[in-house]
UniProtKB/Swiss-Prot annotation:
<keyword id="KW-0800">Toxin</keyword>
<feature type="propeptide">
    <location>
        <begin position="19"/>
        <end position="24"/>
    </location>
</feature>
<feature type="active site" description="Charge relay system">
    <location>
        <position position="112"/>
    </location>
</feature>
<comment type="function">
    <text>Snake venom serine protease that may act in the hemostasis system of the prey.</text>
</comment>
<dbReference type="InterPro" id="IPR001314">
    <property type="entry name" value="Peptidase_S1A"/>
</dbReference>
<dbReference type="InterPro" id="IPR001254">
    <property type="entry name" value="Trypsin_dom"/>
</dbReference>
<dbReference type="InterPro" id="IPR009003">
    <property type="entry name" value="Peptidase_S1_PA"/>
</dbReference>
<keyword id="KW-0325">Glycoprotein</keyword>
<feature type="disulfide bond">
    <location>
        <begin position="52"/>
        <end position="68"/>
    </location>
</feature>
<keyword id="KW-0378">Hydrolase</keyword>
<dbReference type="GO" id="GO:0005576">
    <property type="term" value="C:extracellular region"/>
</dbReference>
<feature type="signal peptide">
    <location>
        <begin position="1"/>
        <end position="18"/>
    </location>
</feature>
<feature type="active site" description="Charge relay system">
    <location>
        <position position="67"/>
    </location>
</feature>
<feature type="glycosylation site" description="N-linked (GlcNAc...) asparagine">
    <location>
        <position position="123"/>
    </location>
</feature>
<keyword id="KW-0645">Protease</keyword>
<dbReference type="GO" id="GO:0004252">
    <property type="term" value="F:serine-type endopeptidase activity"/>
</dbReference>
<keyword id="KW-0964">Secreted</keyword>
């Protein structure tokens, strides 16, 4: 099973829910080797520990969750099996990191987003290609694809060597409001999962993409642990609501304000 719930291993929330770290997919299967050319893996530079997923959005920029940030980190692109390196796999380091100028932290969970500029651009190859930002907002009821190297079992964790993928449904925001009483009223979050449970993002899926109808619509952010509980969907950052900010940063306007 694909567990992609995000448990930030450096945070302990004093809330009724736990944040999913950058982690895995429960209830899924190994991803097709050709379906995740945009999926990247974030590692801690000193310990070489896998931290989170991320998404390559052009040759020089990666989008991930803010809670995945570490002072020293590197990024693997074109990776499938953690222990087997493709000829075209690339490694890059963050040159610049961008968060919202109006927020010094990401305790407001709808702002759990980080834009990373790579120290050198990457070229498209057999296992590397960017995923475009969404042109339209997602629709409730859409079938979405979630993926990552997060744990595939919960609460006892099993971290796989290969990414797992699973299909989940984009649910009405009220479903997550019922599951998480302290959830912000904001609509810049997406609610996605399977009401019956059994399929979910989980620990160390954080930062990875949620793809709905072929468009990059969400970033794995947080959820309840153990993962994949009935009527407790996962929370994802709504990428569409941040496209103007992302495009402004990429264009060089680093003083741009975040959305209200």
């Amino acid at each position: 099973m694909v567990l992609i719930k995000v448990l930030a291993n450096h945070l302990i929330l004093q809330l009724s829910y736990a944040q999913k770290s950058s982690e895995l997919v429960i209830g899924g299967d190994e991803c097709n080797i050709n379906e995740h050319r945009f999926l990247v893996a974030l590692y801690h530079s000193r310990s070489r520990t896998f931290l989170c997923g991320g998404t390559l959005i052009n040759q020089e920029w990666v989008l991930t969750a803010a809670h995945c940030d570490r002072f020293l980190m590197y990024i693997r692109l074109g990776m499938h099996n953690k222990n087997v390196k493709f000829d075209d796999e690339q490694r890059r380091f963050p040159k610049e990191k961008y968060f919202f100028a109006c927020s010094n932290n990401f305790t407001k969970w709808d702002k759990d987003i980080m834009l990373i500029r790579l120290n050198r651009p990457v070229n498209n190859s057999e296992h590397i290609a960017p995923l475009s930002l969404p042109s339209n907002p997602p629709s409730v009821g859409s079938v979405c694809r979630v993926m990552g190297w997060g744990t595939i079992t919960s609460p006892n964790e099993t971290l796989p060597d290969v990414p797992h993928c699973a299909n989940i449904n984009l649910l009405h925001y009220s479903v997550c409001q019922a599951a998480y009483p302290k959830l912000p009223v904001t609509r810049r979050l997406l609610c996605a999962g399977i009401l019956e449970g059994g399929i979910d993002s989980c620990h160390r899926d954080s930062g990875g993409p949620l793809i709905c109808n072929g468009q990059f619509q969400g970033i794995v952010s947080w959820g309840r642990y153990p993962c994949a509980q009935p009527r407790v969907p996962g929370i994802y950052i709504k990428v569409f609501d941040y496209t103007d900010w992302i495009q402004s940063i990429i264009a060089g306007n680093t003083a741009v304000n975040c959305p209200p």
